[in-house]
């Protein structure tokens, strides 16, 4: 029984001694806190002399670029604010308190520099969570609260969606001037060690710079962090630019459709409606500003003018296609030479047989010769035969009438075919013309933006 009893005492004695150790640490911290904050006034600057300046070492660490709102010109970020300063009232000798070199206390319990974001857009200028601070035995106070900011940012959407934005965040003390609180930049570069990538934007550069704002005799220091952002254009390229390019080349194919088809105007009108829908989509994205026109807006405007002209040209071509000698004057000689002979060869079209001639002139000589022969024959025929000749002459007149009618119909048919061929030539001309204009316009509009976007990689 004795060994078992001794074993129980030993087991029970171990946690008792450990608890005593824990209690001593807690008691030391409790005594230290009572010592530090006895008579501590958090509303008073912790300096030895009234003319001393508190140097606040300030740094920024970005954890996430949440959103870049071009419409409202806002940038939303999640950051950590690194702040470090010396509080002369919070010093102690670690040997007097069980070797405690640092403690963590609520930030509401001690003096804090009132550093805020000046370009705040949602009214929450402090924006940070009141986390605990680390107080060291030499009086150094380290506070790194997380914060979520919505800052104003002037957007330049000239090269949208291949644009770059330069947004800034300016931090400074709200009430203290430079003689009371001075800001010192910890690191020129923003800490991006734990940065969570954004799917639409990438940060090319993020640097801080100290500045001073003069207000009379007082100087107010501030630190400005500039973020150079570049948009990743893959989404807009696939779902906005490529469809617009397709619609522009679809407009060119309007001139490849035969004029007999009634779908030429329907296709052009459908393309125009589609472009209007794309324009409404872009209007929801970009800010409503009259200073600059975005690149994609210029391109859509160019294509809409392009399609409108194609509709006008198509109406004219269809009008030419349905011309005939019964509704219009005969084709002018220069039109025949240009559109039936010269242009088809230049456009690599099949030769058109020019059968466009006047039927009255072709049959005038045979008719005259027939009447002369008839007169000669009438002198040599008897009276009985004259009756037969008269009958035959009436039959010949009827045949000539039918022949003239058939030739006239054939003549009208040839005129119609000639005008249709002219319409085909016009279609081919405008096909090549619109294709060249479409390709050239697309290259001229997008080349500067692509150069700038690719240059940012170097």
From Swiss-Prot:
**Regulation of activity:** Activated by a myriad of ligands such as acetylcholine, cytisine, nicotine, choline and epibatidine.
As for membrane topology, the entry says: Multi-pass membrane protein
Q: How does it assemble?
A: Neuronal AChR seems to be composed of two different type of subunits: alpha and beta. CHRNB3/beta-3 subunit is only able to form functional nAChRs when co-assembled with another beta subunit. Participates in pentameric assemblies along with CHRNA4/alpha-4 and CHRNB2/beta-2 subunits and with CHRNA6/alpha-6 as well, forming stoichiometries such as (CHRNA3:CHRNB4)2:CHRNB3, (CHRNA4:CHRNB2)2:CHRNB3 or (CHRNA6:CHRNB2)2:CHRNB3.
One example of the protein's molecular function in GO is: acetylcholine binding
Q: What does this protein do?
A: Component of neuronal acetylcholine receptors (nAChRs) that function as pentameric, ligand-gated cation channels with high calcium permeability among other activities. nAChRs are excitatory neurotrasnmitter receptors formed by a collection of nAChR subunits known to mediate synaptic transmission in the nervous system and the neuromuscular junction. Each nAchR subunit confers differential attributes to channel properties, including activation, deactivation and desensitization kinetics, pH sensitivity, cation permeability, and binding to allosteric modulators.
Which GO CC terms are listed, alphabetically? acetylcholine-gated channel complex; cation channel complex; dopaminergic synapse; membrane; neuron projection; neurotransmitter receptor complex; plasma membrane; postsynaptic membrane
> Quick one: signal sequence residues?
1-21
Q: What is this protein called?
A: Neuronal acetylcholine receptor subunit beta-3
Per the UniProt record, the source organism is Homo sapiens (Human)
List the Cytoplasmic topological domains: 321-428
Q: Which reaction does it catalyse?
A: Ca(2+)(in) = Ca(2+)(out); K(+)(in) = K(+)(out); Na(+)(in) = Na(+)(out)
Q: What Pfam families does its record include?
A: Neur_chan_LBD, Neur_chan_memb
């Amino acid at each position: 029984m004795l060994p078992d009893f001794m074993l129980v005492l030993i087991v029970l004695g171990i946690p008792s001694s450990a608890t005593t150790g824990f209690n001593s640490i807690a008691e030391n911290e409790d005594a230290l806190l009572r010592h530090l904050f006895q008579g501590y006034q958090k509303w008073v600057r912790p300096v030895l002399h009234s003319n001393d300046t508190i140097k606040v070492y300030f740094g920024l660490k970005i954890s996430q670029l949440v959103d870049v709102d071009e419409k409202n010109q806002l940038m939303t970020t999640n950051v950590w604010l690194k702040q470090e300063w010396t509080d002369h009232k919070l010093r102690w000798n670690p040997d007097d308190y069980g070797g405690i070199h640092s403690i963590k206390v609520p930030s509401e319990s001690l003096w804090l520099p009132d550093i805020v974001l000046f370009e705040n857009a949602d009214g929450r200028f402090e924006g940070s969570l009141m986390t605990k601070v680390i107080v060291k035995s030499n009086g150094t106070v380290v506070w790194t609260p997380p914060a979520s900011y919505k800052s104003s940012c002037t957007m330049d959407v000239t090269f949208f969606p291949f644009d770059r934005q330069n947004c800034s965040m300016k931090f400074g003390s709200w009430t203290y001037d430079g003689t009371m609180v001075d800001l010192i930049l910890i690191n020129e570069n923003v800490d991006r060690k734990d940065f969570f990538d954004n799917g639409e934007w990438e940060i090319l550069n993020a640097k801080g710079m100290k500045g001073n704002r003069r207000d009379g005799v007082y100087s107010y220091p501030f630190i400005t962090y500039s973020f150079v952002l570049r948009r990743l254009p893959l989404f807009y390229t696939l779902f906005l630019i490529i469809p617009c390019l397709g619609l522009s080349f679809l407009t060119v194919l309007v001139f490849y459709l035969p004029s007999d088809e009634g779908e030429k105007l329907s296709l052009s009108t459908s393309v125009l409606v589609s472009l209007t829908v794309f324009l409404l989509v872009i209007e929801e994205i970009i800010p409503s500003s009259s200073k600059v026109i975005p690149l994609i807006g210029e391109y859509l405007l160019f294509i809409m003018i392009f399609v409108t002209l194609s509709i006008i040209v198509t109406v004219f071509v269809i009008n030419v296609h349905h011309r005939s000698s019964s509704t219009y004057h005969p084709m002018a000689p220069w039109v025949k030479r240009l559109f039936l002979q010269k242009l088809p060869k230049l456009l690599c079209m099949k030769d058109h047989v020019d059968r466009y001639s006047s039927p009255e002139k072709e049959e005038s000589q045979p008719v005259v010769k027939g009447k002369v022969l008839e007169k000669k024959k009438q002198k040599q025929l008897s009276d009985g035969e004259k009756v037969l000749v008269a009958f035959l002459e009436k039959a010949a007149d009827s045949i000539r009438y039918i022949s003239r009618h058939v030739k006239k119909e054939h003549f009208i048919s040839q005129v119609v075919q000639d005008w249709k061929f002219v319409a085909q030539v016009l279609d081919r001309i405008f096909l090549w013309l619109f294709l060249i204009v479409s390709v050239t316009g697309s290259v001229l509009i997008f080349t500067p933006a692509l150069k700038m976007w690719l240059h940012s990689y170097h």
